[in-house]
Amino acid sequence: MDLLQQLQNQLNQFPSHTKLLLGFSGGLDSTVLLSLLAKLRKKQPHLSLRAIHIHHGLSQNADNWAIHCRQICQQLDISFLCEKVTINPRKGIEADAREARYQAIANHLQDNEILVTAHHQQDQTETFLLALKRGSGLQGLGAMQIQSVVFNLPIFRPLLHCTKQQLEQYAKTEKLSWIEDESNADNRYERNFLRNDILPKLRQRWQSIDNAVQRSAQHCFEQQQLINELLNDEFNKIYDKFDRTLSIANFATYSILKQKALLRTWLQHLHILMPSTIQLDNIMRNMIQAQEDRNPTCRLGNQVLRRYQKRLYATPILQDLSHIRLDIQANECINLPDNLGEICLLTKNEHLQVTWQNKQILLPLTQEKIEIRFRYSGKVKLPQGFHQEMKKCWQDHNVPVWQRTRIPLIFYGNKFKSAVGFFNNCE
């Protein structure tokens, strides 16, 4: 079966995939897939096809590669995007380039559009062996699937069961032109080391190793899917779809293995980087088994796991706002820091109406300076007439500890007046 027919068969299995965004590096693999998709589009005019090239700026040839990719797309009448990204070498070039690449693609992906990549069978072998080197479990050893989600991006890999030799033969027959990335010869990169030094020897000894690895990866994937299916009912009982939190109130009744599996399932639902064995053990010890009065945290990638009242939360990395003070006047709106949105103070019927995140409060008008802060540790006078510590007020409103310094507090001069949307100081 030729490549075009294989591609057609894969697309037939996913009839909803009619808007495609091809990740186009300009290398042999993506050039072959671009050619195949262009041919297929002639047969299926309803197919929407665009290509995106990520300019990493890591090579002195990067500008020429972008020009080459643009020219190829122009020849095929395919809409072309080029996005420049900045790589942070301190995070590791391979990992950061991958993350930056997916983030750039996410910025351009349209509704109902799916990212298409040219991963093939030999790429699958490399991915499997790298996961094995890291000590991955079933999730990691499942490697790549024809359709999956990575960094919240839907990805379609229609060539995953095709060999590199098939792609090379197609490129030769069609007289395609492509770029050669000189970094592919640099064995300091783990994938290159496997590709250039290790796998040729394995293939010389065992000619069918790529097929065998692909079967093993599929077995691992299916076993992980079965575990997810068996855990599904239990998981749904403890997972809150509204705030995406996980209850650990009854975790002590589960085996340690089941606790870890439920944690992984939750992280997978949130598309959070899977923890290493050491990280998972730390989460179990420092978060699940910690004393109830503790507020432990654990960072995973760009997310932070937190615990409050026997539930686990996942939040972005939050800016410390406790020191911030913002002046504001009546009939003024200002933007709050760290993406907290806009707050407005409007005079209305001899009161000051404060609006923030669909919450409203009314305060008396004042001639004093009005200030927004994010921290107060004194006492609050309640409508019932008695005073209560600020901490107890937050607890009564079930506000997690880390959110308490992200709620705007209104001050008249140095006097606390309101935690917007939650409670007022009746002094």
From Swiss-Prot:
Localisation: Cytoplasm
Organism this protein belongs to: Histophilus somni (strain 2336) (Haemophilus somnus)
Residues at which ATP binds: S25, G26, G27, L28, D29, S30
Stated family: Belongs to the tRNA(Ile)-lysidine synthase family.
Gene3D superfamilies membership: 1.20.59.20, HUPs (3.40.50.620)
Catalytic activity line of the entry: cytidine(34) in tRNA(Ile2) + L-lysine + ATP = lysidine(34) in tRNA(Ile2) + AMP + diphosphate + H(+)
Broad class of where this protein is predominantly found: cytoplasm
Protein name: tRNA(Ile)-lysidine synthase
CDD domains per record: TilS_N (cd01992)
Keyword Transcription annotated: no
GO cellular component, one term: cytoplasm
GO BP annotations, alphabetical order: tRNA modification
Role, per record: Ligates lysine onto the cytidine present at position 34 of the AUA codon-specific tRNA(Ile) that contains the anticodon CAU, in an ATP-dependent manner. Cytidine is converted to lysidine, thus changing the amino acid specificity of the tRNA from methionine to isoleucine.
EC number: 6.3.4.19
Superkingdom of this protein's organism: Bacteria
Record comment regarding domains: The N-terminal region contains the highly conserved SGGXDS motif, predicted to be a P-loop motif involved in ATP binding.
Broad EC category: ligase
GO molecular function, a single term: ATP binding
Keywords: ATP-binding, Cytoplasm, Ligase, Nucleotide-binding, tRNA processing
